[in-house]
């Protein structure tokens, strides 16, 4: 326990930042709305109405004062209804735009102390900068190396916090600027009250949709709290040589923690500390889904589940449903993770041993980590995006029919190449051919819809090869990467795993 207290004290150094005055600086909003900055991190850029509006200190001050008024929320909702039917000039979208921009600027500001902490931590540990934003594909070689030697796996869905106040409490030990915390609390309660006004229960969904950057920052800080003691015990038990598997894949592993966690551990976890100091525990997470695997028995995994449930209950003050943590044997279980269907196969082999004049057969078993393309979820994603029917029958994309022929083919080709690139690590790529067929025929039918023709007539007139330039096969891409003298055979590349180091997020069509 003394080691835990020292670890907490070391990683909980208070932040003495005065962040609130930065909210009145105009350049903050330039950073908040810079598409290139948004593209460098893991959030999609958000399009705002009225991009050409300019900010000033007076305007921001007036907006903040007005946002703190009690009738501001009611005014927004009433003005929205009036504008919808009466077309008033003081539109809801104008006020919503300014409110969004202040919220977006605030999200940039609160990231500043954690970015500085991340840089200093990386320099202390001598972590290369290229690994600081590592590819999400770097998780799979780690799983490929470890899972085949383990016995049990637990598939975990990290629960969302029930109340937004929990997120504010998490940040209190990191940000000691009281006005900034009050403003954060206001934003969170504003979205919660807005959902009550419009009779909606999707508070977290609406908040994450309207301000993705701030939501993911708060969610990552919350997840890092969930993982904090797990990382501590893992550091005490073993040393991970693979830095890519523990190097802030989402810039989410921050270090400040709350003081009363020591009391929580002393009072509530003294009976559950001993079983989790096992060096054979392996933990991987992406977004809200985590994988916990061990060579130990089923009882050990049940103790880990007991630890997680009690930690969430006593530290975050909410109960986690047991069904969120499934414990299964790796030999009889397949699970979805990051768009792949993962499993461990058993390949029996018979080895003939010759000793002098006697020979005998030795039966042996080799475990193999298998990565499968989930064809049914992929077809479901294509169906939701209106590329095909639910049964996989290709259809045209009417919303793209007004684009030029080049843009239509380029968009379909980009989706096809992205899927081929992401699933280059699959052990069986034949399933991807059906997805490529759906996209090609959907592209042909979209072009035929634009030219008021049929897909068959279009293909007969232009030929089957006119799409090949855009729907580049993975083997053709690899031919430019690997020299001809290499031992790697492109003919068998559909059976080879190729993990890419330039993929920082999953494509929208991938089921995650």
UniProtKB/Swiss-Prot annotation:
The family database entries (InterPro entries) matched by this protein are listed as: Domain_X, Maturase_MatK, Maturase_MatK_N
Q: What GO cellular component term, any one, is given?
A: chloroplast
- What GO molecular function annotation could you give as one example from this UniProt entry? RNA binding
Where would you say this protein principally sits, based on its record?
A: plastid
Q: Where in the cell is it found?
A: Plastid, Chloroplast
On the tree of life, the source organism's domain of life is Eukaryota
- Keyword tags: Chloroplast, mRNA processing, Plastid, RNA-binding, tRNA processing
Query: Alphabetically, which GO biological process terms does the record hold?
Result: mRNA processing; RNA splicing; tRNA processing
Q: What does this protein do?
A: Usually encoded in the trnK tRNA gene intron. Probably assists in splicing its own and other chloroplast group II introns.
- Enumerate the HAMAP family for this protein: MatK
Q: Check the record and name the PANTHER family matching this protein.
A: MATURASE K
What family is it from? Belongs to the intron maturase 2 family. MatK subfamily.
Name of the featured protein: Maturase K
